[in-house]
Amino acid sequence: MAERRPSGLERSPTAPPVLSNGHFASIGAEGDASSYEHGVQVIDENKEFNPDLSKYLSLENVTPAGFNYHLISVFGSQSTGKSTLLNHLFGTQFSVMSELERRQTTKGIWLSNNKKQGDAGSAERMADNILVMDVEGTDGRERGEDQDFERKSALFALATSEVLIVNIWEHQVGLYQGANMGLLKTVFEVNLQLFLKDKHTTHRSLLFFVIRDFIGTTPLKNLQKTLLEDLSRLWDTISKPAGLEKSTIHDYFDFQFYGLPHKGYQPDQFVTEANKLGLRFREGHRDPKRDALKGEFSEGGVFLPEYHRRIPADGFSHYAEGIWDQIVNNKDLDLPTQQELLAQFRCDEILREVMIGFDEAITAFEDKQAESVRVGAPEVLGGLGVAMRAARVKTLKSFETEASRYHKGVYQRKSAELQGKVDTRLKALFHGQLSAAHKSGIRDFSDSVSAAVKDGQKKGGSYDFAEIVAKETQSSLEKFEEVAHSTLVDGASWSNCTQELSLFKKELAEVSARLRRDEMRRLATRVERWVQSRLGESVGLEFNALGSGRAGGGAPENGEKPTEKDFWDRIWNLFEETVLDAERRFTDRASSFDASIDEVDVGLWRLRRKSWGVLRAKIEEEMIEGNLLLKLRENFEDKFRYDEAGVPRIWRPTDDIEGIYTRARESTLTVIPLLSRFRLERTTAPPPLDRWIGHTPSTATPADEEDLAPIGGVDEHEGKSLEEEMTILSDAKRQELTVRFKKAADGVYVEAKRSAIGGMTQVPLYFYGLLLALGWNEIWAVLRNPAYFILLFAFAIGAYITYQLNLWGPMLKMTEAASQQALEEGKRRLREFLESSDTGRQAIAMSAGERAGSSGRKEEYEMSDMQKRASNANDDLDDM
């Protein structure tokens, strides 16, 4: 019987004046645990959801049940005994209709826990934690044509419940409205949209038709056949989404049918059958031998695993509220999404909780690593691996314990998300640790090798570079592997140091190769300096000896001394011998570096190119215009001033100065074209520089070539031929050099000519006759006197010998020099005497006035004298 509710001041504004299920906890009612003893209102008639649903579940000890609970809903027409049926099946105390008033009793949706647990020792007992929802009936006069709540409540029941009990009377079978076919059609249409949201899982529900007032006249099988046919036709008429046109109702729903006797006419049978029906609400399994399409249904437990919505009990309240919010706001209901939202809500909460502990364990390491990277000094963190492994295991295990009961897909996704977050941070730490170990290892390796090399050099320069590299490489690898293995995290796919170890080995090899190249560069530099020193000496000697008759250049070809024709052959042979010796030195030393054949080839190739550059630079140094002109003059003077025996010539008027000059000049001029091009005498062609240097090795890097000067005939891209590379003097330089040499040679010739003319005394012929006439007596006196005669004879012999030895010129020059020196010495002594005596000082003062007057005349005289001398010199040159 319905009771009157409290006054308006005491009840909720949304509560009706007549109390329905007044002994239940309704929405807006406040009370203690006793008010939830019989159940709770989930949704009121105004479509308001009860936020205290979770409180009721906690009081009934359902919240910690996890998945060990079941939800049943009942719907059907109003006043058909739905609440009565639930009370008999589950021992609940839902309010029932007053038979005297025939009005609506259940308003909204109410929920109660199963009060019938059955015998614990019985083989057949009801399942634990059965939650029963009593849904407001349809087709009531109170709602009239407003079927909105009917559809929403039915959809809510279908979306949340495993089993939907459809309560109908036997005489309503075959009817459309009486059998709630219109409502089922709407539910089916919307439900198809729900199933489309999750194509990986087909959610099934059980529609349990309880046929009331079953008298048995029409067999139950015929009734269920009629209902199935109606449901199938109803299914065929609904609009199906794309891809589900050929689907059947059995793809989404299972069906059970049970007939109950008339409660008023057969009360005992009704109670008995209701008890039997109640025992059906237990866990069961699908019987593969029964075909639902043929009307064969299992009579065992109705709670099949596929019916469960897999919503943990502690999240059901939040899930149901979300479902109702979707329904009441006329949004497309998406059950998988709602389940995912619930799971996401709970998993997010759990995730945040477990991440707090993770942060406490890891953040300090992250900060320290970030700081070391910021300052540019990566540091290997001690104890990182232990902390990472412990934090990961604890975090993932805690999340699994709390969140694994929720929607599998969401749990897996959130678990993957958590694992992703954890692994992302741990992976960053892991790679940061390996990066620090990598960088510090490379740095330490390079420093250790350099230190060992320097130590070896200090001890005497004898060290095995390859042995040093191998030792330090092994040490670096052991340190890196120790750090990497101590940082590995079990179970993490990214926790693998194989790639990093491979990269570390690769970079060690690259650094080793770079250090080896640097060491070989230093070796090459030392060898190049040695080549430069050797070539500088030997080539300098050849150029110094160029064309010197005394040194052999001007000697005949069949003589013991080399000729000028094979000058470049000697230079090239010296060059080849020197470089070959340098290559042996380089190869022998490079073998201790464990250098590859390719590296040695590159080193030798560079050495040959560098050596040619040294030779070319030395030749250019020797061939500087001033140096070359001096060498040509020396060459000319050696041939002009000295005879074939190397004796200096004393020019006499009778000597063939012009012939000797011409031969010496022409011989020297032949040296200029010889020196202008580097050609071998034996082949009359430039040396095979391109073959001697060889092709660029395939392993040569741009760094190996960047400091090399281009060589004509070898580097084709330079556009310079071998002939151009071997050209030492251009045509213009040759012509200029020839002109300048001829001028210098002419000067030497003029000097020689003057020397010959200056030694000749011009005595008139009549002087000899006058001398004979006037000195006849003296001549006879000398001839008759033996002493005079002997003295004259000795003087004549001395003069003859002097003449034959061509010593008159030197003797005259010596005499002139001695007399000049005596004159200068006399002038000096006279000046000292005049300055030291009074008489001398007075004489100097008297001559000072006269000197000023005569200065003009003196300058005029000196200028005239200079012009006269210049005119005489030009006349002498014209005469020669």
UniProtKB/Swiss-Prot annotation:
Biased composition (Basic and acidic residues): 856-868
Chief location: endoplasmic reticulum
Protein name: Protein sey1
Keywords per UniProt: Coiled coil, Endoplasmic reticulum, GTP-binding, Hydrolase, Membrane, Nucleotide-binding, Transmembrane, Transmembrane helix
UniProt binding sites for GTP: G76, S77, Q78, S79, T80, G81, K82, S83
Transmembrane segments: 763-783, 787-807
A single Gene Ontology CC term: endoplasmic reticulum membrane
Entry similarity comment: Belongs to the TRAFAC class dynamin-like GTPase superfamily. GB1/RHD3 GTPase family. RHD3 subfamily.
Known function: Cooperates with the reticulon proteins and tubule-shaping DP1 family proteins to generate and maintain the structure of the tubular endoplasmic reticulum network. Has GTPase activity, which is required for its function in ER organization.
Span of domain GB1/RHD3-type G: 66-320
Signal peptide stretch: none
The protein's Enzyme Commission number: 3.6.5.-
Membrane topology type: Multi-pass membrane protein
Coiled-coil blocks: 496-519, 856-880
InterPro entries: G_GB1_RHD3_dom (IPR030386), P-loop_NTPase (IPR027417), RHD3/Sey1 (IPR008803), Sey1/RHD3-like_3HB (IPR046758)
UniProt-listed PANTHER family: PROTEIN SEY1 (PTHR45923:SF2)
